[in-house]
A protein has these predicted regions:
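N-terminal, polar/charged subdomain of small-to-medium soluble alpha/beta proteins
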Residues: 1-84, 92-122
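Phosphate/diphosphate ligand-binding glycine-rich loop within oxidoreductases
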Residues: 88
């Protein structure tokens, strides 16, 4: 599941939706806007190609790791300090595969940010 939205997300709701009898681990990551010198927040452009890029990241993770499901939610627009930016959740029968997949997904998304993230000064 890949979603780009303006509104916030619920980590608990996403994780609850990933539970199933064969799943033994659900790993979640929530990225937030951190303070930076003179910063008011970050602006993420709502780009059409972003959805496709995130879907490709999801697809690669499913193919590479022994996982059951992936959820990626990325917010767009202006996000102030401490606001949620990104949710990545991965479910698997074993924790190692879930941790490894989650880390891989986060690293790939971080590379995407270089093209559609802009710092906003106070």
């Amino acid at each position: 599941m890949v979603e780009i939205r303006k509104g916030d997300f619920s980590l608990d709701e996403v994780a609850a939706g990933m539970k199933s009898p064969e799943v033994g681990a659900i790993i979640t990551y929530s990225g937030t806007v951190r303070q930076f010198p003179g910063g008011a927040g970050l602006n993420f452009e709502d780009r059409q190609e972003a959805v496709q890029s995130l879907k490709q990241i999801e697809k690669r993770a499913v193919e590479k790791f022994d996982i059951a499901a992936v959820a990626i939610i990325h917010r767009v627009g202006f996000l102030g300090i401490t606001e949620n930016i990104l949710l990545v959740a991965v479910s698997a029968s074993r924790r190692k595969a879930a941790f490894d997949a989650c880390n891989s997904i986060i690293n790939e998304i971080k590379d995407l940010h270089k093209s559609w993230q802009r710092e906003v000064q106070k």
